[in-house]
Each structure stands twice: as structure tokens, then as C-alpha cells.
UniProtKB/Swiss-Prot annotation:
One of its GO terms (biological process) is tRNA methylation. Binds 1 [4Fe-4S] cluster. The cluster is coordinated with 3 cysteines and an exchangeable S-adenosyl-L-methionine. This is Probable dual-specificity RNA methyltransferase RlmN 1. [4Fe-4S] cluster binds at residues 113, 117, 120. Gene3D superfamilies: Aldolase class I. It comes from Opitutus terrae (strain DSM 11246 / JCM 15787 / PB90-1). Coiled coil: none annotated. Specifically methylates position 2 of adenine 2503 in 23S rRNA and position 2 of adenine 37 in tRNAs. Its main location: cytoplasm. Its EC number is 2.1.1.192. Disulfide bonds join 106-341. It is an enzyme of class 2 (transferase). The active site is at 91 (proton acceptor), 341 (s-methylcysteine intermediate). S-adenosyl-L-methionine binds at residues 163-164, 195, 218-220, 294.
């Protein structure tokens, strides 16, 4: 099987080119073109050295990831089912921005997920394997290509799809570098967000990497007991320890950290829960995203969760804002095609090809 250019660094490719008798300096141009043209190499632009493109096309696959299916929601959100070289599948999502020429992308970091969050569809599929950096890059390129076909620019990406990014941190960081750095994808560091359920060692490792990216933490409860029932990771790391790790990240980064909070009817959505959350956050510079729960059927524990009503969600929002917490109530993107938060499962039988 031919390797993918998405798996290579500039130094990796430079060594290959040198073995072929080409200048090492061509490697940077090859990869810049590859990323700018969404995973393709063409004759456009200034001439290439004789035979180089032909040799690259022979030795390297455009990518090991293929589009298996595509589905478009009523709100314009597009979900891609991508088949990996080993036959496994993952999902990536493109979300149109309110600006007509922009879009955001959601990337997966693993096939399945081992975190077992009780209200998440991905958890019900279990964990199969980590994605390579190149497989994550190929998701990015697929979404960039999808955005371009719709006349949009892929402006930001979030690692919030299938999997826990901090359990695949080395590959995720490599993918982030390839996506953000001008040598490769050129998206920009501040345009990348990595999400976690709150794995303290992983947050500290992300801090040590010092990449200038954004951090989002899926909290989903203001107290340890409620959180432990919803997220098994809550039994390993107390909220106080998670926020201490977030403080260390923020001290080196200087930008607000995002707190993700999925509102579940009768579970974590009362005014008292909101006041507890505000107290936990205190004076920290955080932005809370309140998420509408997207039903996934019975949970791992056999619970049928329901989304909070509009009145409860509005009251929760008001309680936080009244206490000085920057808060937004996010609308679901693509729930009608199971593309919204917590709905990704990568089942081919549930996704049909649409044009």
C-alpha cells in the first residue's frame, strides 16, 4: 500500500526527494501545494522539476481516506463518512458559518471512543483504534474541499468528533501542527480547538506543548457526583483538579477556555445547577457553551435522556450571565442527519450518499 503525503513532514519528504536526486528544498513547496489544493498535486503555477510530479503520484497515494458517504442537513451542515485504508470508518462534519463565505469543521481523533460518556452515541460503538496524524489531516483536507465546493473557506477546526483527543495526543499534536502551520495547511494556531472530557495529565501535556491553540473542556455538571454518573472520567478526576489543570493551561495561553455543558432535562439543568456552576467557575476567564442535547436513544446505562425545555435553558443561561459568566446557548447543527454533538457513530448503514 502506498503511503499518503498527509503522513509526511517536510523533513520526511525532503529525505525522499534527496534519494530521488531532487533538491530537498522542493519538499516545502510540494506540501504547501498539497494542502492548499485539498490533497491534490497539479501542474498549475510555476513549473515543477522534470518528472517530480509523476514520481510523487507513483510513489504516494493522494490519501488513504476515501469518501464513503455524504449527507446534508436542512441547516446546511454536511456530514462526511470517511473510509480509512483498513476499512474502518469515521465521521467529520462541516458547519456553515453565519458569514456566507466561512465554515467550521469538526474532526475525529479516534475510531470510536473509550470514554463511555452516558449520553453520547459514539460511546455506544466502543473504541477500535487511534487515528494517525495523516488520517486526521485527510479529514481536514476533505472538509476544506467540501467547503470550497460550496464557495466557503474552512476558517476553524475543532477536535470534537469521535474519540478523546488527549488519549491520542502525540498524533493529534502532529495533526494540529500540519493543519495550523503555514508550511502545511496554514489555518493558524488560534483557529484550532482541542476538546477533552477533562483528562488532567493530557491537559498538562497540552500545556507543555505550547502550541497557542484553544482548549475546550466537556464539564456537563457542576458537581462531582452528577458528573461521575454522566462521564466515567468524572470518577477519575475531580472538577477541582480539572480546573486546576485548566488554570495552568490558561496561565501559559492567556485566552478564555471553553466549557461545554450539555443540558439534560431533570439531570443538570436546574437554576441551582447553574448557580453551582457559576460558583465553580468563579473569576476564571471562561466561556460557557450551553449545548442542546441531541437524543441518541437509550444510553449505556439504559437511561433515555431528554433535552431541556426552552424555558429551563433560558433560565440556566440567565442565572450564569447574572453572575458574570460569559455564556452562549448554542443551537444544534445537523441533528436531522445525526451530525450534532454526541451523535457521531460512523455507521455506514445509517448514512446514504447525497449530492
Amino acid at each position: 500500500m502506498r503511503p499518503s503525503l498527509a503522513e509526511l513532514s517536510v523533513d520526511d519528504l525532503a529525505s525522499v526527494l534527496a534519494q530521488w536526486g531532487y533538491k530537498r528544498s522542493h519538499a516545502g513547496r510540494v506540501l504547501r501545494e498539497y494542502y492548499a489544493r485539498c490533497g491534490e498535486l497539479t501542474e498549475a503555477g510555476r513549473p515543477w522539476p522534470a518528472g517530480l510530479l509523476e514520481r510523487l503520484r507513483i510513489e504516494f497515494a493522494p490519501g488513504g481516506t476515501a469518501l464513503a458517504a455524504r449527507q446534508v442537513a436542512a441547516d446546511g451542515t454536511t456530514k462526511l463518512l470517511l473510509r480509512l485504508a483498513d476499512g474502518r470508518t469515521v465521521e467529520a462534519v462541516l458547519m456553515p458559518d453565519y458569514r456566507a463565505d466561512r465554515a467550521a469543521g469538526c474532526l475525529s481523533s479516534q475510531v470510536g471512543c473509550a470514554m463511555g460518556c452516558d449520553f453520547c452515541a459514539t460511546a455506544q460503538s466502543g473504541f477500535e483504534r487511534n487515528l494517525t496524524a495523516g488520517e486526521m489531516v485527510e479529514q481536514f483536507l476533505a472538509l476544506r474541499r467540501e467547503a470550497a465546493s460550496a464557495g466557503r473557506k474552512l476558517q476553524t477546526v475543532v477536535f470534537m468528533g469521535m474519540g478523546e483527543p488527549l488519549l491520542n495526543l502525540d498524533a493529534v499534536l502532529t495533526a494540529v501542527r500540519r493543519i495550523a502551520d503555514n508550511t502545511y495547511g496554514g489555518l493558524g494556531w488560534r483557529q484550532v480547538t482541542v476538546s477533552t472530557v477533562g483528562l488532567v495529565p493530557g491537559i498538562d501535556a497540552l500545556t507543555a506543548a505550547d502550541l497557542g491553540i484553544n482548549l475546550a473542556v466537556s464539564l456537563h455538571a457542576p458537581d462531582d457526583a452528577t458528573r461521575a454518573a454522566l462521564l466515567p472520567a468524572g470518577r477519575r478526576f475531580a472538577i477541582a483538579d480539572i480546573l486546576a489543570a485548566v488554570d495552568r493551561f490558561q496561565a501559559s495561553r492567556g485566552r478564555p477556555v471553553i466549557i461545554q455543558y450539555c443540558l439534560l432535562k431533570g439531570v443538570n439543568d436546574s437554576a441551582a445547577h447553574a448557580r453551582m456552576l457559576a460558583a465553580v467557575i468563579g473569576s476564571r476567564r471562561m466561556h460557557v457553551n450551553l449545548l442542546h442535547y441531541n437524543p441518541t436513544g437509550l444510553s449505556l446505562r439504559g437511561v433515555r435522556y431528554e433535552p431541556s425545555g426552552d424555558e429551563a435553558a433560558a433560565q440556566f443561561l440567565a442565572e450564569l450571565r447574572a453572575r458574570g459568566v460569559v455564556t452562549h446557548l448554542r443551537r444544534s447543527r445537523g441533528p436531522d442527519i445525526d451530525a450534532a454533538c454526541g451523535q457521531l457513530r460512523a455507521k455506514r448503514g445509517e448514512l446514504s450518499v447525497q449530492s
